[in-house]
């Protein structure tokens, strides 16, 4: 009688052996937010009083609707602030690695600052920075 070799290879049995930890991590990461939301829904204080459902702002009850129009000047200041805030975000890593970057990065940073100075002069001439 001839022995028939088994078709089962040991390498194919452990094909997913590297993914068990990842799968467990994925399951835990999916369950934690669901359990946290369920626990907060079950453990929260139950209050049926209507006074607790009203909004509270600076010690006074709000009067009127919430849809009011803001002045356009607020948006202009916010826009100029965002522009120069983004400038700071881009210039900070450059300043940290200034010695390693060399002359080309210094010239590029000067061009970037020049463009932002032109934007500041433009906003100044358009009177976007004046509150009148």
Swiss-Prot record:
The keyword Translocase applies. Its main location: membrane. It is a multi-pass membrane protein. It comes from the Bacteria. Signal peptide: none annotated. Its EC number is 7.1.1.-. It holds the Pfam family Oxidored_q4. GO terms for cellular component: NADH dehydrogenase complex; plasma membrane-derived thylakoid membrane. Belongs to the complex I subunit 3 family. HAMAP family: NDH1_NuoA. This is NAD(P)H-quinone oxidoreductase subunit 3. It comes from Thermosynechococcus vestitus (strain NIES-2133 / IAM M-273 / BP-1).
């Amino acid at each position: 009688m001839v022995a028939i070799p088994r078709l089962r290879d040991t390498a194919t049995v452990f094909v997913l052996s590297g993914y068990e930890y990842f799968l467990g991590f994925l399951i835990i990461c999916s369950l934690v937010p669901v359990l946290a939301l369920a626990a907060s829904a079950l453990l929260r204080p139950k209050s049926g009083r209507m006074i607790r459902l009203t909004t509270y702002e600076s010690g006074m009850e709000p009067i009127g609707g919430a849809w009011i129009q803001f002045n356009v000047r607020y948006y202009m200041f916010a826009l100029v602030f965002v522009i120069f805030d983004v400038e700071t975000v881009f210039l900070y890593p450059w300043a940290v690695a200034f010695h390693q970057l060399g002359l080309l990065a210094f010239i590029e940073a000067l061009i970037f600052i020049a463009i932002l100075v032109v934007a500041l002069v433009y906003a100044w001439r358009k009177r976007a920075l004046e509150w009148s």
